[in-house]
Structure formats: structure tokens, C-alpha cells
């Protein structure tokens, strides 16, 4: 028998009352947690994501934060147009669209041989390259060392950052930061809202966050990817050179590689610090120019912008183990090194599939931006002691599997 109208109304009122009180309880509890824990950055994070129907950071977050502007070059490098016509196959197009690709560009030498955009993303659109910015920071470190502002790769961090002069931190060097082997206790999770990564993205005190980290293992022993290392490098550059990071980036690289558009770097607050571990916004074509600089081992128009010795050192992988307990073949001085194919690929990488791939043997640069990526190739638990399996896949482990597809597409277009 169905409920009478009066009983139904009472039931609806009761349901709404319980729902309202539940929501009120959750809001009060969340606010109490934020206030008592001091994690006020969560307000910014919630307002920038969940209240806008998003679950996390996106490539178009530029106006969510205050930012610095890095002016484009006065002498723009014009890409030549390829005389040949290339296109994606239906299968490749489907692959790109399934991963919400926003741009895919292929350059060979001085020529732009393929360029495609999706949705509202166009050639003038700037997007966040996320952690691909880490490699940009590394190039700036190389310049600062070569010019004598930073003494050497093996200079203690404490020379520039006072909080690292005492205790276990005084053993950490610039090289350790670049190799992601500092031994610091940094929470890198991109999904955990309570991680150091989340606080660094939405918070307003980057210096306080990175200098308060504790040492939990001996530096230089294990590869452990941490965005805090990159941020410390940025502070070292500023302390050593006396210049703001964005100004230094403009003077030493961005103005010298023929960039066509301004770039933007998110700050932690008004007149604050650049989020050097991520959050550099630029156009896909300008990211291609950065890839070309890497491809040419730091040289542009016959001039050595980044020292050659540093570019060669940058792509070496040190004799240390990864978290899987295998030799590190994947990461040099803040640059990814893929040696699982026929020829080496050196690349900048950011979450959600931001890539600037340089393939020296093909004189090739590939830029991909978008909002999704595939998972990293990881070591299955049951294969950890299988030496044959490890030998076969050790140079692919830790790389996102989609780069293999992008490399394949780029190489197909240059045959």
C-alpha cells in the first residue's frame, strides 16, 4: 500500500532535515580540521577544483593564481613549413582523443612538420607544462654554475639556503637535488590533498614548506622523485644570482631562443615565489623551441646558451637504485631519459601528459599537451625477483607508456 500524502510529506521533510544536518556537520568538521591543522591552502584547493566541478589541477589554471610574466623574444624564430603533408591515422586520432589531447606538434630541424589542436586550444593558447618546468629550472642551474654564481654541482645547499647549514641537511648538495636523491621527507602524491605537493600548488609559503623538510635517508643513495627538490633549486638560483627566477629565465633562455609568445609562471602569492616545480605556462610552439634547445645540446643560432659540459652531464643516469630496487636509467639532472628504444630520447614531462620530447638521432622534437596520460610502466610484484624480466624491461620502467606511442608517430612522419 502506498504512503498517504501527509506521511509522504513528513518523510520528505525528515529526509531533507537529516541531509541538511549531515551536510552541515561535514562542513563544520572540514573547517575545524583545516583550522586546527593549519592547512588553510585547502580552501584554495576546494574553491579551485570541487566547487568548479573539477577533481584536481588542470592545464588552464593560469588565472587561478597570481603569476609573473616572462616576455617573448624580440627576435622571433620562425619555424619553416614542411613541404610534405602529414596526418594522423584514424587509430592515432582516436588514441589522442581518448587521452584528451589538446595539441600535438612534430618538429624536425628548423621545420614544423605536423601541428594539430583540439577543442578551443589553438597555437596562441598557453597551457601549464606542469613538471616539464623542472627541466627548464635545471638548464638555468647549468648556466648559473657556468657563470660562477653557483660554485659547482657538488656545492652544499646550505651555502645558499641557511636552513640547510646544520644537521643532516648540510650533506645535501645541488647535485642531489637535481638527481632527485636528496633524502628529504617530501610527500609527492598528486591525489592526496594533504600531501606536500598539494600544499605547494595551492599554498602561499613555498619557502617555508621546502625548508622545513626533514632528512629521512642518506642523500645520493636512492632516486626518489620530489617536487620540493626543484623548488629548492629555484631558491638557490635566486640566492646565488640575486635575480628573480622569471627575470633570470628571460635573460638567460626565453629571450634567446626566439620565443613568439610571453610565458607565465604561477606564484605562491602576490610578489611571491615562482612555483618552479611546475606551473610554467607557454604555447606549444614555444615549448617546441625549448625542446630544440635541448636537442641542440644547449646551442641556439651558433651560440652556446647552456654550457655543453652541463648538457652532456644532464643526460647521464647515476649509479643509484630506484624505489623498485633497480638501477636508475630513467632520470638525469632533472631530465627524463628513455633508453628503452633503438635510440635515446630525452624529455621534459608533466602530469596529465605534458611532454617535450627530443630525439637527437632523428633531429626530432615532439610536443604533446593534454588532460590525460597513461599509467607508468611499473614492475609487477611477482616479477621483482625475475632477472630475465628485469633485464628486458628495466629501461622502460618508470616511464609513462604513452610516450612510446608519441615517439612512434613522430618517427613515422620523418621516414
Describe the residue ranges of each PLM region:
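N-terminal leader/targeting segments and the immediately adjacent pre-domain N-terminus
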Residues: 2-121, 150, 398, 403-415
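Structured C-terminal helix/loop/strand segments within mature extracytoplasmic catalytic/sensor domains
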Residues: 15, 31-40, 48, 348-415
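Active-site helix/loop module of the DD-peptidase/beta-lactamase fold
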Residues: 147-185, 212, 239-278, 282
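Active-site-proximal alpha-helical segments within enzyme catalytic domains
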Residues: 229-236, 276-299, 354-371
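Active-site Gly/Thr loop motif
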Residues: 261, 315-365
Amino acid at each position: 500500500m502506498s504512503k498517504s500524502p501527509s506521511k509522504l510529506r513528513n518523510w520528505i521533510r525528515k529526509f531533507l532535515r537529516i541531509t541538511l544536518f549531515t551536510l552541515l556537520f561535514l562542513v563544520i568538521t572540514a573547517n575545524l580540521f583545516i583550522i586546527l591543522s593549519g592547512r588553510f591552502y585547502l580552501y584554495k584547493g576546494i574553491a579551485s577544483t570541487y566547487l568548479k566541478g573539477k577533481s584536481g589541477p588542470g592545464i588552464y589554471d593560469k588565472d587561478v593564481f597570481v603569476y609573473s610574466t616572462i616576455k617573448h623574444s624580440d627576435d622571433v624564430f620562425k619555424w619553416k613549413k614542411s613541404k610534405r603533408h602529414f596526418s594522423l591515422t584514424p587509430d592515432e586520432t582516436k588514441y589522442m582523443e581518448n587521452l584528451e589531447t589538446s595539441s600535438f606538434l612534430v618538429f624536425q630541424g628548423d621545420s614544423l612538420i605536423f601541428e594539430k589542436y583540439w577543442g578551443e586550444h589553438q597555437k596562441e593558447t598557453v597551457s601549464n607544462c606542469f613538471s616539464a618546468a623542472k627541466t627548464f629550472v635545471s638548464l638555468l642551474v647549468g648556466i648559473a654554475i657556468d657563470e660562477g654564481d653557483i660554485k659547482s654541482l657538488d656545492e652544499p645547499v646550505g651555502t645558499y639556503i641557511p636552513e640547510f647549514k646544520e644537521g643532516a641537511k648540510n650533506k645535501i648538495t645541488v647535485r642531489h637535488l637535481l638527481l632527485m636523491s636528496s633524502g628529504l621527507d617530501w610527500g609527492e602524491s598528486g591525489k592526496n590533498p594533504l600531501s606536500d605537493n598539494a600544499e605547494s600548488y595551492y599554498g602561499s609559503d613555498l619557502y617555508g614548506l621546502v625548508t622545513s623538510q626533514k632528512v629521512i635517508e642518506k642523500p645520493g643513495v636512492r632516486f626518489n622523485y620530489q617536487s620540493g627538490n626543484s623548488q629548492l633549486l629555484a631558491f638557490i638560483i635566486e640566492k646565488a644570482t640575486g635575480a628573480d627566477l622569471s627575470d633570470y629565465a628571460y635573460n638567460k633562455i626565453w629571450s634567446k631562443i626566439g620565443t613568439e609568445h610571453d610565458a607565465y609562471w604561477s606564484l605562491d602569492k602576490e610578489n611571491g615565489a615562482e612555483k618552479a616545480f611546475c606551473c610554467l605556462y607557454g604555447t606549444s610552439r614555444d615549448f617546441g623551441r625549448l625542446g630544440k634547445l635541448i636537442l641542440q645540446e644547449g646551442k641556439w643560432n651558433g651560440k652556446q646558451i647552456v654550457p655543453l659540459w652541463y648538457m652532456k652531464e644532464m643526460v647521464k643516469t647515476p649509479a643509484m637504485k630506484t624505489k623498485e630496487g633497480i638501477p636508475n636509467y630513467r632520470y638525469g639532472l632533472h631530465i627524463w631519459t628513455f633508453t628503452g628504444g633503438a635510440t635515446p630520447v630525452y624529455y621534459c614531462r608533466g602530469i596529465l601528459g605534458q611532454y617535450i620530447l627530443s630525439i637527437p638521432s632523428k633531429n626530432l622534437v615532439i610536443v604533446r599537451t593534454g588532460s590525460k596520460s597513461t599509467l607508468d610502466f611499473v614492475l609487477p610484484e611477482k616479477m621483482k625477483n625475475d632477472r630475465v624480466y628485469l633485464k628486458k624491461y628495466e629501461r622502460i620502467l618508470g616511464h609513462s607508456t604513452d610516450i612510446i606511442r608519441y615517439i612512434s608517430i613522430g618517427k613515422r612522419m620523418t621516414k
